[in-house]
Design a protein with these regions (language model features):
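N-terminal core-binding DNA-recognition domain of tyrosine site-specific recombinases/integrases
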Residues: 39-45, 69, 81-162, 200-203, ...
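C-terminal catalytic core of Y-nucleophile DNA break-rejoin enzymes
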Residues: 38, 44, 236-238, 247-248, ...
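Short, basic (Lys/Arg/His-rich) helix/loop patches that form interaction surfaces
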Residues: 194-205, 270, 286-295, 300-312, ...
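Short, Arg/Lys-rich segments that mark the N-terminal edge of DNA/RNA- and chromatin-recognition modules
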Residues: 1-43, 202, 240-248
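C-terminal secondary-structure termini that scaffold catalytic or DNA-interacting sites
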Residues: 3, 234, 245-267, 274-276, ...
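Catalytic-site neighborhood detector that most strongly recognizes the C-terminal catalytic loop/helix
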Residues: 243-245, 358, 377-403
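Basic, Lys/Arg- and aromatic-enriched nucleic-acid-binding interface segment
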Residues: 135, 139-143, 154, 158, ...
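N-terminal DNA-binding module of tyrosine recombinases/phage integrases
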Residues: 18-118, 285-300, 394
Length: 411
């Protein structure tokens, strides 16, 4: 039988109420729609219960506002998230981070029933033009707004989902001139790696980028690799977990965690090419001399990659390094091109994920078996593999046509 909680004066406390022994303040705890524990504080019990009553009324008023169609996008998004009880913690944290950063303080304050297709299109263009988002980041924003509006449709708050078709329009009308296409070209790939290998500051990044370009691993999969995941005899690498970096708690400070692959396709064994093996052996010798990486994350240890502080790098730090390397290379290339009176061959802006796509493109250029490519890449949906294959082979076909046009004289 549950015991009745009482305060220091012996008065019976209601569910959720408590009195702290440290400062004798009263508190009422509740869980918000996002599953986070919240507290209401007061110096005395009477004041606390007045605050509880106001809080309960506000909750009911919020429901009335929703039913009346006067709710904001923020209100419906929070409601949507409260219903997604099966989300993994990493996914939930990423959703909240993206929403809070790009939507909550602007578009999120609009009344959802008053938003039209053109409003969404205008907001997306604002994110692209004024906030500098790339299309893939905008797609992440879209994956939050579309189901939010879809919930409002199902609850009959709005008749149609105004986000339908917006991303298709964005992709059709806005040809991105900045940034990189999905994969680096072979000359770009070589320029990037040669610059790293010959640079006195960036050379320590060579093994990691060699592994990324030589395996097609996701950045979290690569950073999470342990020595036990390598089989030198069979020349294979086991991909069975991933390193994730996401905010937790009220402070929203980010920490490293180990995450299992979302799908069965993510668990796979991939080949270890000679250059990748060389990169691993280089790191093995370095740790053998300087000391093994003893960092433990969620019970796992023996990680291959570590930074100068002895910690496992997080994905954001890798992407920041890529930006520094690109800036350094491009600055030097512009100087050299000017000296040699030629046009500079610059590296485009890209992230670690583009290196995975680059590997997949190189693989598609050599391998015709889509099932093999899908298995190596860990694609859940073969359509993803087919899209990359189509892009890679189309470029090869165009190159062949250009060579043919230069050598074949039929007139």
């Amino acid at each position: 039988m549950a015991t009745t909680r009482k305060d220091l004066r012996g008065r019976t406390l209601r569910k959720g109420e408590m009195q702290r022994s440290s400062d004798k303040r009263y508190a009422y705890s509740y869980t918000d729609p996002l599953g986070r524990r919240k507290y209401i504080y007061a110096n005395d019990l009477v004041t606390l219960r007045e605050k509880e009553a106001r809080f309960t009324k506000d909750q009911m008023d919020g429901l009335d506002i929703y039913v009346a169609g006067k709710a904001t996008v923020n209100f419906v998004f929070d409601r949507y998230m409260s219903l997604k009880t099966n989300l993994r913690q990493t996914t939930r944290s990423n959703y909240l981070y993206m929403y809070d950063r790009f939507i909550r303080d602007t578009f999120g304050k609009k009344k959802i029933a008053e938003i039209r297709y053109s409003d969404v299109l205008q907001f997306y263009n604002y994110l692209l033009d004024k906030q500098g988002l790339q299309t893939n980041t905008l797609e992440s924003v879209h994956t939050l707004l579309h189901p939010t509006f879809q919930l409002a449709v199902r609850d009959e708050i709005v008749r149609k989902n105004p986000t339908d078709g917006v991303m298709a329009e964005i992709k059709k009308s806005s040809e991105q001139t900045t940034g990189v296409r999905h994969a680096l070209t072979i000359p770009q790939q070589r320029a990037f790696m040669e610059h790293i290998a010959n640079h006195p500051v960036f050379c320590h990044w060579w093994p990691l980028f060699t592994v990324l370009l030589g395996t097609g691993c996701r950045i979290g999969e690569a950073l999470g690799l342990r020595w036990d995941d390598l089989d030198y005899e069979r020349r294979t690498i086991s991909i069975n977990h991933s390193l994730v970096y996401y905010p937790v708690g009220e402070s929203r400070n980010s920490v490293l965690h180990i995450s299992k692959p979302k799908t069965e396709a993510g668990v796979r064994t991939i080949p270890m090419f000679d250059t990748v093996k060389d990169a691993f052996e280089m790191l093995h010798e370095e740790q053998k001399e300087s000391g093994w990486n003893d960092v433990e994350i969620d019970g796992m240890s023996g990680f291959i990659f570590c930074n100068r502080f002895g910690n496992v790098p997080n994905p954001q730090s890798v992407n920041r390094a890529i930006k520094r390397i690109i800036a350094d290379y491009n600055a030097g290339e512009e100087v050299e091109a000017k000296k040699q009176h030629r046009e500079a061959v610059l590296l485009p802006d890209f992230s670690a994920h583009h290196l995975r796509h680059t590997f997949c493109t190189r693989l598609c250029e050599k391998e015709t078996n889509l099932k093999v490519i899908q298995s190596v890449m860990g694609h859940k949906d073969i359509q993803t593999t087919m899209d990359i294959y189509a892009e890679a082979t189309e470029e090869k076909k165009q190159e062949s046509f250009e060579r043919l046009a230069a050598t074949l004289d039929i007139f």
